């Protein structure tokens, strides 16, 4: 009798299982992150239509970019090119200066040197450059670490962009004052000294060649600026979107990367390790001690972080959308060029938001 009671239930099981499987929708697999090859120009694309974005808002975006003196513009989603546009005589093979956007290359190379045990960003800078690299009293100079250079809190006088010893005078104790200045360039010397080779050689071997970038450094008397094509800038943005990993190789460890794109001090919470951070309660800008009580770009995604350079060079990384946005070009407002943040950011995001939905 026990067998007779159990059998009908067992017979029903396959049908119940079948019915459940047919009623439930098949989950859509998450799209994998794509990485272009390092050896050719092939790069997968993805259409705006396939993303469900607003195609009719693309022409106004392109018109805006052209009118604002842009040279190039790219959007990547999961590493695939959704938009790639060139303007005002520029081309895919032409190089363009990154300006201060390249500070993030220095930050990243510094992090790689730390993960290789060549330096520690919490040690004294003088441990790598020797005593007397500034004109400060030794007890004040010894307060400065590479971390202070990464966070713009060295306390050194910021009146001159020319980073020579006579200009590096005391203004405040390290860590007590945020001020955007060129003294971050001393990180280039720290990496060179700790790696026992030129910064450029170390950068090429540990970062540039690993992710297939092109380009070169121009070490000028005052400014040190990286130049490359637009896709090389996009490759670097993609590396950060994928948390420092390129294909199967961890180029920069996640611990340092997360520090770099997080608030690094409480004076200007919108600043990491030479990266700008959106979604914070306040921010400061180059050349001013004014504190603005709002997010960096209020109409952009709150989780966005950005590399920002003079004349509106931009890398925007938006993890929540698996998206990287690149803009290279001349200043959007030639009469009022800015070193970093400008009104261009909010205006551009108005146009991007009309496309991305």
Regions of interest found by a model, annotated:
Residues 1-16:
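Sec-dependent bacterial lipoprotein signal peptides
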Residues 16-91, 96, 114-119, 151, ...:
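N-terminal leader/targeting segments and the immediately adjacent pre-domain N-terminus
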Residues 64-74, 85-129, 142-144, 171-178, ...:
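Short active-site loop at a secondary-structure junction
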Residues 79, 96-122, 149, 186-191, ...:
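Active-site SXXK
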Residues 83, 321-330:
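Short, well-ordered beta-strand elements
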Residues 116-154, 195-229:
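Active-site helix/loop module of the DD-peptidase/beta-lactamase fold
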Residues 212-319, 333-342:
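Penicillin-binding protein/beta-lactamase superfamily catalytic region
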Residues 326-357:
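C-terminal/domain-terminus segments
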């Amino acid at each position: 009798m026990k067998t007779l009671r159990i059998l009908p239930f067992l017979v029903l099981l396959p049908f119940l299982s079948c019915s459940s499987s047919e009623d439930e929708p098949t989950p859509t697999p998450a799209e994998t992150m794509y990485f272009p090859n390092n050896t050719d120009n092939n790069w997968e694309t993805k259409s705006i239509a396939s993303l469900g974005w607003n195609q009719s808002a693309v022409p106004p975006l392109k018109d805006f970019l052209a009118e604002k003196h842009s040279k190039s513009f790219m959007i990547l989603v999961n590493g695939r090119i959704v938009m790639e546009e060139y303007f005002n005589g520029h081309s895919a093979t032409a190089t363009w200066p990154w300006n201060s956007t390249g500070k993030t290359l220095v930050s990243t190379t510094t992090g790689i040197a730390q993960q290789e045990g060549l330096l520690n960003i919490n040690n004294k800078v003088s441990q790598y450059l020797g005593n007397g690299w500034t004109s400060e009293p030794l007890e004040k100079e010894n307060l400065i670490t590479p971390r202070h250079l990464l966070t713009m809190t060295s306390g050194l006088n910021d009146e001159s962009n020319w980073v020579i010893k006579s200009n590096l005078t005391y203004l405040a104790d390290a860590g007590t004052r945020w001020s955007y200045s060129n003294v971050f360039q001393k990180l280039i010397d720290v990496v060179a000294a700790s790696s026992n080779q030129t910064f450029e050689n170390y950068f090429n071997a540990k970062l540039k060649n690993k992710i297939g970038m092109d380009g070169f450094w121009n070490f000028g008397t005052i400014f040190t600026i990286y130049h490359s094509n637009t896709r090389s800038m996009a490759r670097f943005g993609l590396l950060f979107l994928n948390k420092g990993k390129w294909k199967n190789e961890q180029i920069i460890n996640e611990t340092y990367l997360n520090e770099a794109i997080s608030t690094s001090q409480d004076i200007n919470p919108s600043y990491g390790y030479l990266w700008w951070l959106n979604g914070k309660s306040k921010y400061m800008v180059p050349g001013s001690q004014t504190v603005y009580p709002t997010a960096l770009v209020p109409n952009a995604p709150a989780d966005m972080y950005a590399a920002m350079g003079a004349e509106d060079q931009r890398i925007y990384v938006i993890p929540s959308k698996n998206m990287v946005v690149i803009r290279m070009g001349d200043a959007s407002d030639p009469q009022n060029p800015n070193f970093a943040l400008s009104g261009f950011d909010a205006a551009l995001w108005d146009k991007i938001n009309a496309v991305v939905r």
